[in-house]
């Protein structure tokens, strides 16, 4: 009987751990943040124009643009179809590395990335990870100011694709 109870309790704990928390809006984040930390912005433009606008705004802000990865092209080379999907990678090393001084594992989330993709209905989106969520993910809770500032910057960048 105790073994059965232990099994049920263990199963309940595992299910509880696997169940994602509800969507969250961080008090100081400009947009609703999904439970996984993703901020999804609906673009008013097609893929090429969305990418061009984002890259132009990144450059205008003096942020280093590292590269873009055409994920659909990579998938097609292996005979896999995923649809238009481009990952933009950019950042400000002086700021990003400051985040990593608080927890070096936070480097998994830097440089900054925006995923631009077109869904099955033809709608283009730009997605990124909320910086306050990243801070919480890595146990950085002492000072939210730089993360809030980073949210403002990326929010400004993605606003360039919204009418």
Question: Across the structure, where does each feature detected by a protein language model lie?
Answer:
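Small-molecule pocket liners
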Residues: 37, 86, 123-124
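C-terminal partner/receptor-binding element of secreted or periplasmic proteins
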Residues: 131-163
């Amino acid at each position: 009987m105790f073994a059965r109870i232990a099994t049920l309790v263990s199963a309940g704990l595992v299910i509880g751990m696997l169940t994602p928390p509800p969507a969250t809006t961080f008090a100081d984040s400009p947009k609703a943040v999904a439970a996984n930390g993703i901020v999804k912005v609906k673009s008013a433009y097609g893929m090429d124009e969305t990418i061009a606008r984002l890259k132009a705004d990144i450059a205008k802000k003096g942020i280093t643009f590292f590269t873009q990865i055409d994920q659909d092209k990579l998938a097609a080379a292996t005979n896999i179809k995923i649809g238009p999907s481009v990952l933009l990678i950019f950042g400000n090393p002086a700021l990003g590395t400051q985040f990593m001084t608080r927890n070096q594992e936070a480097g998994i989330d830097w440089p900054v990335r925006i995923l631009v993709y077109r869904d099955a209905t033809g709608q283009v989106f730009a997605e990124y990870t909320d910086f306050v969520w990243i801070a919480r993910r890595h146990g950085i809770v002492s000072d939210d100011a730089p993360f809030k500032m980073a949210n403002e910057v990326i929010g400004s960048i993605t606003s360039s694709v919204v009418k």
